Curated annotation (Swiss-Prot):
Location of Phosphoserine modifications: 16, 26, 59, 90
Species per Swiss-Prot/TrEMBL record: Schizosaccharomyces pombe (strain 972 / ATCC 24843)
Compartments in which it is found: Nucleus
Phosphothreonine: residues carrying this PTM: 20, 24
Lineage: Eukaryota, Fungi, Dikarya, Ascomycota, Taphrinomycotina
InterPro entries per record: NAP-like_sf, NAP_family
UniProt entry tagged with the keyword Disulfide bond: no
Family: Belongs to the nucleosome assembly protein (NAP) family.
Name of the protein described by the UniProt record: Putative nucleosome assembly protein C364.06
Primary residence: nucleus
Amino acid sequence: MVENVNINNKRAGKMSAAPTPHNTPSGTSAPNFGAKAPQVNTIDEGDENLEAIDGKLGSLLHLTSEGVSELPEAVQRRISGLRGLQKRYSDLESQFQKELFELEKAYAKKYAPIFKRRSEVVRGADEPTEEEIKKGEAADENEKKEPTSSESKKQEGGDDTKGIPEFWLTAMKNVLSLSEMITPEDEGALSHLVDIRISYMEKPGFKLEFEFAENPFFTNKILTKTYYYMEESGPSNVFLYDHAEGDKVDWKENADLTVRTVTKKQRNKNTKQTRVVKVSVPRDSFFNFFNPPTPPSEEDEESESPELDELLELDYQIGEDFKEKLIPRAVEWFTGEALALENYDGFSDLDVEEDEDDVESSSNEEVSDSDEEDSDSKHTAHGQQNAAECRQQ
């Protein structure tokens, strides 16, 4: 799981700020829930107690920064010995991470024939064999699961249906982080998505490949998004995320889903004449995923910001969700089974009453935009409404 931390600092002193790949250990031990809390004296309002506590805090800070050098020589030698053992552990952990990455690459090659067969069935290039069908039915019986809504409403006929329509779009919409990126306009284009694949590079990193059938939105047959890890490992000898690169989408005329057309009125200050112009402004779309945020360079520290860090972390997490969730278990996301397993904690959202003052304040707010008027994007491929706000930018 990606850590909720700053991920764009590459300097050695800040390596711990970068997230680690989803399937690597975080390097921290589990909390000891059985441990007793430290006993702290009750703080009264008297100055005497406050001064005593202040003195204890000062001694702790002193021990943290300088106390080791003041310990007896024999104790310092033992600490040096522990550091030597820690170095041996770190070397082994570094070797483990490298071998784990190579193991992932090796098994990716073994998974490839399975995913290829899945792609053939989804796009309608081939039908599943009797053996494949029997194994799937046997797995359903072993799990003794209740039928999903899609299974309980089987439709008659459908013999002319090719493959599994909107397989990947449906699966993606069942993954929370991915569904939040998809706008109503995006669905028309994503319905032409026939496969999503992952491949590994020689250098640490992975590539996502999105294959599309011919469609009225863009000319690309395959769109890729590549995630790169840093060459040098972090303090825990795990791979650290560096940056991502995506393909440019070659949009067909008037079909760009990442922009919308806005009609604006302009007035000449001298002649007082007005004219109407149309400009394109960015809008939310899943396809912004292929134009990832760029981490600032090491020299450009001024461009660092919490907002950029959040965008970088979100972009990396989305890539991990494709890699670790959607691609390995696509059919379970399509049927909704994986979504049920995600809700393992048994908690559900509760209805919370809003503060009356907040509700009244919100109802009294007015939004005025006399200068701009959203116009129909006039996409030749569809006539859906403008997208709702989503996280991916």
